[in-house]
Design a protein with these regions (language model features):
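Short, structured helix-loop boundary elements
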Residues: 7-14, 31
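An amphipathic alpha-helical interaction segment
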Residues: 1-5, 9, 44-46
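Short coil turns linking two alpha-helices in DNA-binding domains
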Residues: 41-42, 90-91
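Short hydrophobic/aromatic patch on the recognition helix
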Residues: 44-45, 49, 94-95, 99
Length: 145
C-alpha cells in the first residue's frame, strides 16, 4: 500500500512536470524551474523522468519543442526562424541542428517533404475520384463497371 502511494505520488510529480513543460515550452525553461513548480529537487525530478519516461527532463523538453515545431512546419507561410523562436529556441541555428538530429533532415527539407507527400496524396486521391466518376459514368450509360 505504501509503495503504491509512493508510485502514485511519483507519477503525479511527472504528470505535473509534463503539464508545466507543455504550457511553457515556448519560454526559456530550466529543469530547476520545472522542479520548483513540482516542489521536488532537480535530481529527484531527473530520476522520476528516467523511471517514468526513459529520458531526462531536458530530453523531454527538447522532444516536445521539436514535435511542436514539426507541427508548425506544416503551415507553409510560417518562417523557420519564427517557428524556432515560438518553440523556445533563441538561436535558429541551434534549432536547425536539434531538428536535424531528431528528424534526420533540416526543417526546410522536412517542410518540402511534407508538401511533396501532400501533393502525392492529393494526386492519388484525385486519381481515385476520377476513376470513381468514370465507373459511375459507365454505369449510367449502361456499360461495364
Amino acid at each position: 500500500e505504501e509503495r503504491r502511494e509512493e508510485t502514485d505520488r511519483a507519477n503525479q510529480y511527472v504528470r505535473r512536470a509534463v503539464e508545466f513543460i507543455q504550457r511553457n515550452y515556448c519560454n526559456p525553461i530550466r529543469v530547476t524551474d520545472v522542479a520548483d513548480y513540482v516542489c521536488v529537487n532537480r535530481s529527484y525530478l531527473y530520476t522520476l523522468f528516467q523511471k517514468s519516461l526513459g529520458m531526462s527532463p531536458q530530453q523531454f523538453l527538447a522532444a516536445y519543442r521539436l514535435t511542436k515545431a514539426a507541427e508548425m512546419l506544416m503551415v507553409p507561410h510560417l518562417p523557420v526562424e519564427s517557428i524556432a523562436l515560438s518553440c523556445g529556441y533563441q538561436d535558429p541555428l541551434v534549432f536547425s541542428k536539434a531538428f536535424r538530429q531528431m528528424k534526420g533532415v533540416s526543417p526546410t527539407m522536412y517542410r518540402k517533404q511534407i508538401q511533396q507527400d501532400e501533393n502525392r496524396v492529393n494526386r492519388e486521391h484525385l486519381k481515385q475520384v476520377e476513376e470513381f466518376i468514370s465507373r459511375v459514368g459507365r454505369l449510367e450509360l449502361g456499360g461495364e463497371p
